[in-house]
Amino acid sequence: MNDFRHLSRDEQKLLADVALLVKDDDQEFNYEMLKVAAPDEASGEFWFRMAEMLSTLPPNQSLDLRMTGGRLAVAVSILSVLLQESPDIPQLWAQKVIALNYLAHGHRTRALGLAQQPDKAAEANEEEYLAKALSQNLFSTLKDALERFPEDSWFIEMRDDAWQHFGSEQAV
């Protein structure tokens, strides 16, 4: 477990609450509210740790695919802001890649499942659109990460994996 003693008490408490929400796989909760509940002077590490927790799968391995208020979408949002401020930290890029990878794969899988049901064609198309948009974001993020860290084997492997799963027409 991470040592958060150097964070403020308010930051520690909120991170403990986040950990419980993730552990319990609460997919009714609007995780955007955590940003509002954060201390006014929250540290960059606090925000990274929150995004890291939100992009970690709960014990039941369930993906929260909600694009508004969902765990993974909020993690991507937080990490996007952090990357604007600190683009030279590879862990930020990696965590964003992880969250986007989960979202893109989850929506692609949902689209394929819905496509098997004739009465769900519209929903399948919507999910496929989301999967494509998320995979494009994933490729763009990997491209930017590899421009900064061209020799990083993890980013290279993730790019190759994304290429294999989402098609070479979008790959970096």
What feature does the model see in each segment?
Residues 36-37, 81-82, 118, 145:
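Canonical positions in the second alpha-helix
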Residues 25, 70, 104-106, 167:
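Residue-level detector of the short coil/turn that links helix A to helix B
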Residues 18-32, 64-78, 130-139:
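Helix-turn-helix repeat elements of alpha-solenoid scaffolds
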